[in-house]
Amino acid sequence: MTTATTALPTLAEPTASPLEIARLVALHSLCFVLPLSALGFFLTAPHGRAGALAWLLVAVTSLVADWKSAGEKRQPAATLPGWPFDSILYLLFTLQLVNLGLLVQMAATQNFWRMDSFVAWQLMGITSGYSGIVAAHELMHRKAPHRKALARILMGLVLYEHFFSEHLRGHHVRVGTPDDGASARFGERYQAFFRRTVPAQFRSAWRLEARRLGDEDMRWNDPRLLRSRVVHGLVLEWGLAIAIAVIFGWGAFVLWIGQAFVAVRLLECVNFFEHWGLERRGPRISPVDSWDTTSWFTLYTLVGLSRHADHHAYAARPYQQLRHCDESPKLPAGYFGMVLLALAMPQRFERLMTAELKRRQLGPFR
């Protein structure tokens, strides 16, 4: 793994007090807002039209809270116990499984054309993107095989298991270069990026696995592909989707595919603005190769994902230890707000991002 060329800020106190640990655990527990909201929705279904739509207010509230969020630049202690923060990830994994099970059950037992189905599609998709995939991203960077396995399961539940191979051995090696399909170019709009990055990342994952097996150019019918993780992921994720259709009906299948689509759209929207317009110089990664945000709400709701510069410098560093980097360019909003800008206000998105690149003399202004 490449390391940063610029010295990163020092940590806070060498050892956190029990009170500080409890404070951080409580703050990071904000990540349960979306999955617990989805759980509440499923457990109280069926709803009337207005009652169902009211559950989407959690997404609106999250957007407003993120937009109004104060900055968080405090550095973590050098030593924090791992188990309380790891427990948060395991609980997120469990909630994702439970919520998806309840989604399928609801689709199998209720009229598909109720407002509940639309809200379930949106709410579960948002939860899968902001909770399931975020937990998967953290777990796939851990060394323990069982944690990596949990990450692959979570990605398979949104029909995107190949992301595991591409992200670790593709994106983290090629970030900010023309060879990285997950890095957005200067001036690129999200819709164009999405159409480019999805097939590019799949091709990258396929080639990386083929290379691991001995031949990057092996044909599709090569028996060695039976050992490809990408092939395993395709078989398992689509096998599960087909089984859901057969056992629970077409309505459950449609909602399953629908929540996966929303989740992947969110994932790639985050990928879009995390490196938009940045051009890496040289073989080593530095803090200026990723966009950060100081949003307090994003930091704790998305388990540290927003400290992206430090993550790329030290990919195995657990989320509670990630540091704020003054050198990295700063997003004009938190992640929830940035998704809105990228999807609904592309001209404003480009204007604000370009201004920051000019101010820091990064990207095409270097």
Predicted regions and their residues:
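Membrane-helix boundary/interface segments in integral membrane proteins
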Residues: 74-77, 209-210
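Intramembrane catalytic core of multi-pass membrane enzymes that act on lipidic substrates
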Residues: 76-198
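Intrinsic disorder/low-complexity segments
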Residues: 5-8, 13, 55, 66, ...
